[in-house]
Amino acid sequence: MSADVSGTESGSESGPEPEPGPEPGPESRPESRPKPGPGPEPRPESGPEPGPRSGLRRGPKQGSERSQLCPEHFEPLSWFCLSERRPVCATCAGFGGRCHRHRIRRAEEHAEELRNKIVDQCERLQLQSAGISKYMAEVLQGKNQKAVVMASAARDLIIQRLSLVRSLCESEEQRLLEQVHGEEERAHQSILTQRAHWVDAVQKLDTLRTNMVDMITHLDDLQLIQREQEIFERAEEAEGILDPQDSEKLSFNEKCAWSPLLTQLWAASVLGSLSGVEEVLIDERTVSPLLHLSEDRRTLTFIAKKSKVCSDEPERFDHWPNALAATAFQTGLHAWIVNVKHSCAYKVGVASDQLPRKGSGNDCRLGHNAFSWVFSRYDQEFCFSHNGYHEPLPLLRCPAQLGMLLDLQAGELVFYEPASGTVLHIHRASFPQVLFPVFAVADQLISIVRGPLATVRLDSPPHHPCRSGHASR
């Protein structure tokens, strides 16, 4: 777009514009100065030229610039036309010249601006290269080590469980080990691919930066202007190299080691053996005043009114009908069974020793905080609850017994029905170091099954119709 030099148009490029008058220059000159003749035009007055940034050297001296003359007026190409994007002489830019009404600026100013842009781009390329190098050195290396460790842990877990049921699942063992190996190879290959990609990206960035530095140091103003399009193309190519981002494809997927068949057989093997069942007793100091504890410390019975006999100990739950076991689990594999056939409102599971005991808030309510993981029933509704999240469990019948299997090494809590051999729910998490079996009952009673009774299986378990409980969840 053209604009009259006498106006005050503002454009994206700053610089002096020509004014009407007898002088051929784009700036106003002193009245005492003569009109330009056919020879070289005197240099217009200007302030000190800005020096190059970041310590980069300027191009060749002005002697080589004067050797470039206007083909029409044979004058130095000391000005740059922003409208036609080409260098022009002072006569072309002055009054009556072909670029008289165009936006112009000094060629050296335009070249200096290009130099500054190249310097800025070089700095950005250097920072981008440093970021990619840091990503390769820290993130990719850590991902590779973590994938190897996680793959090894998953492999050991699979072999340990399959040792209990080797005769029934040899083919399953082979399949799962191949999946773990394939996932490990996939994660490792993804990391290698990422590393190769970013090494190539760094090399491209270094090459682009080197070429741009060469342009600054070896090209004069006119040559630099003539290669402006190439400069922008290289800058655009550099912008096309994105910054590295973390991805799940670089991580080992633990789900490749999960197997419903393996979990079913493993849980049945542990709960079906006498040595696999814990001797769990309830800690009478934690029993709520709404519950009555039997003499053998295995049965909890709900009572409508709070007992006045219970002392107010710090370990006791004073509002919700809860109780903790006296047995603490810190490592290894643990299993226990609870008889729940008489109750339509109960919760069973595990809880951390950090579970609060006093008050009516959710911080003391099982399944509504981060310190408890429970299987709960209310009337005909079943769910798994943790930290306020309740996952419904569609059961076809009310279980008479509930088996719990806690594997602290694998971070798994399995709720299991011993009578049918059915896994009701599996929860995987990073559990705290100390866990206790936890119980809550708001209807009738529940009781912990003794160890020797854990091997009992009912060929046709009796159906217990679900009764509506009267206590709140």
Curated annotation (Swiss-Prot):
<keyword id="KW-0472">Membrane</keyword>
<keyword id="KW-0862">Zinc</keyword>
<comment type="function">
    <text>May regulate epithelial calcium transport by inhibiting TRPV5 activity.</text>
</comment>
<feature type="zinc finger region" description="B box-type">
    <location>
        <begin position="65"/>
        <end position="113"/>
    </location>
</feature>
<keyword id="KW-0863">Zinc-finger</keyword>
<dbReference type="GO" id="GO:0005499">
    <property type="term" value="F:vitamin D binding"/>
</dbReference>
<dbReference type="GO" id="GO:0006816">
    <property type="term" value="P:calcium ion transport"/>
</dbReference>
<keyword id="KW-0848">Vitamin D</keyword>
<keyword id="KW-0109">Calcium transport</keyword>
<keyword id="KW-0963">Cytoplasm</keyword>
<dbReference type="Pfam" id="PF00622">
    <property type="entry name" value="SPRY"/>
</dbReference>
<dbReference type="GO" id="GO:0005737">
    <property type="term" value="C:cytoplasm"/>
</dbReference>
<dbReference type="InterPro" id="IPR003877">
    <property type="entry name" value="SPRY_dom"/>
</dbReference>
<dbReference type="InterPro" id="IPR013320">
    <property type="entry name" value="ConA-like_dom_sf"/>
</dbReference>
<dbReference type="InterPro" id="IPR003879">
    <property type="entry name" value="Butyrophylin_SPRY"/>
</dbReference>
<feature type="domain" description="B30.2/SPRY">
    <location>
        <begin position="259"/>
        <end position="455"/>
    </location>
</feature>
<keyword id="KW-0106">Calcium</keyword>
<dbReference type="InterPro" id="IPR043136">
    <property type="entry name" value="B30.2/SPRY_sf"/>
</dbReference>
<dbReference type="InterPro" id="IPR006574">
    <property type="entry name" value="PRY"/>
</dbReference>
<dbReference type="GO" id="GO:0016020">
    <property type="term" value="C:membrane"/>
</dbReference>
<dbReference type="InterPro" id="IPR001870">
    <property type="entry name" value="B30.2/SPRY"/>
</dbReference>
<keyword id="KW-0406">Ion transport</keyword>
<dbReference type="GO" id="GO:1990830">
    <property type="term" value="P:cellular response to leukemia inhibitory factor"/>
</dbReference>
<feature type="compositionally biased region" description="Pro residues">
    <location>
        <begin position="35"/>
        <end position="51"/>
    </location>
</feature>
<dbReference type="InterPro" id="IPR050143">
    <property type="entry name" value="TRIM/RBCC"/>
</dbReference>
<dbReference type="GO" id="GO:0008270">
    <property type="term" value="F:zinc ion binding"/>
</dbReference>
<dbReference type="Pfam" id="PF13765">
    <property type="entry name" value="PRY"/>
</dbReference>
<protein>
    <recommendedName>
        <fullName>B box and SPRY domain-containing protein</fullName>
    </recommendedName>
</protein>
<keyword id="KW-0479">Metal-binding</keyword>
<feature type="region of interest" description="Disordered">
    <location>
        <begin position="1"/>
        <end position="69"/>
    </location>
</feature>
<comment type="subunit">
    <text>Interacts with YWHAZ/14-3-3 protein zeta. Interacts with TRPV5 and TRPV6.</text>
</comment>
<keyword id="KW-0813">Transport</keyword>
